[in-house]
Structure formats: C-alpha cells, structure tokens
Amino acid sequence: MSASRFALPLLILAILAPTASVARAQTGNRVVNIAMEDQFRNRRETGVFRGDVVVLVYAERKGAEAALELGRRLHVLFHPTAETAPASEWSRQPVVGLPGWPASVRVPDVHVIPVACMPEVPKPLQTVARSRMRTDSPHVSVWLDFEGVMERTFGMVPGGPNVVVIDTNGRTHSVQSGHLDELEFKELAAAVNQIRIQSRPDIRTASQPATIRR
C-alpha cells in the first residue's frame, strides 16, 4: 500500500525539515469538539465520532511529511485491510477487533484524521488550496485549518507531527508532538486500544491520560 493515499494531501504543503524538538503536553480531561471544513467544503467535527476514538494528526508545512507517514501507519495498524484496498475504499476499511469483545456490542472505531494547518494562506488563496487538495486527494477527507485552531487549542511543534487523541466520550486524552520512535509509536497505539477497551459497557471507567514520552 503506497503512503500516497494518505500522503498526497499533506505533501502539497510539505518540505523536508530537520527533526523537531520534542514537546511535552498534558491536557485536561475536557470535552472538545474540533470543527472545520475539508477540501470539499464539507463541515467536519470530532463530535460526530462520539463512541469512537479520534486521532488528529496535524502539522504545518515543515512537518507535513512526517505527519503523513505517522497517520498512514496508524490508520493501517487499526484498519489492516487498508494495506491492499483501492484508493476509493482506503478510509472505509473495518477496524480491527478487540480480544474478548462481546459479539453483540459494536467495536469502537479509530478515526485517524489528517489536518493540514495553513493559517499563513490568505483568504483569497484558500480556494486555490482547496482545489489543489481536491485534485490530489479525491477520496480521503483532509481537514483544512486556515484559522490556527489546532495550535491555539492544543499547541504545535513545527517540523514534525503533532497528535491529539480524543477518547470515546469526546474528551481530550493526550497530546504529543515530535517524531516518535518505534517504542513511542507502540505506546501510542496501546493507549488508543486501552481507550477502546475502557469503553466496553461492563468495564467502563474514566479514561485517564496516558503517560507517553513526548
């Protein structure tokens, strides 16, 4: 599976950049609803995914390449059939199950959402940016942050990926910035799965922010 299916939207803004400094961020257990439009001018918001885990992978242009690769890896990890799916179906693949999950209960999905942060694009040129995004990403929705929402709400480290995890109740679980090594990637994936497990009706507990090296 080529990374381009996730990569193209963010590659529009990407340039090679040095490794970003690692940032540590601790968030409150607050409910959030991040809303913006995608390249098709469709309104998108995290609130509609209540009951699932949302992973927002965002970056400015210097961090776009690393962000796209991280997002692609996360999506394929939780949706393995995406590896061989056609481009038109890549983002619609079923989520991997959880051991011991009741057959009668819906398994929480994991929505890995690419966000292109472009506050520097002036309003008259935003139409051009949307058009280019539609051409390069006709199937995968890319949220376009022209207003600096992500940086204002969660902070952002330039030159690398930034990740926000939102739990099944719509609460900010964790925020991390900077390049992840293999162990950190596994810790992030484990934290997402733990949120999914905790949402099971018979064992539901408050989702606690994971201690992840950032």
Name what the model sees in each region.
Residues I34-V53:
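A short beta-strand-turn-helix
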Residues M1-S4:
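N-terminal secretory signal peptides that target proteins for export/translocation
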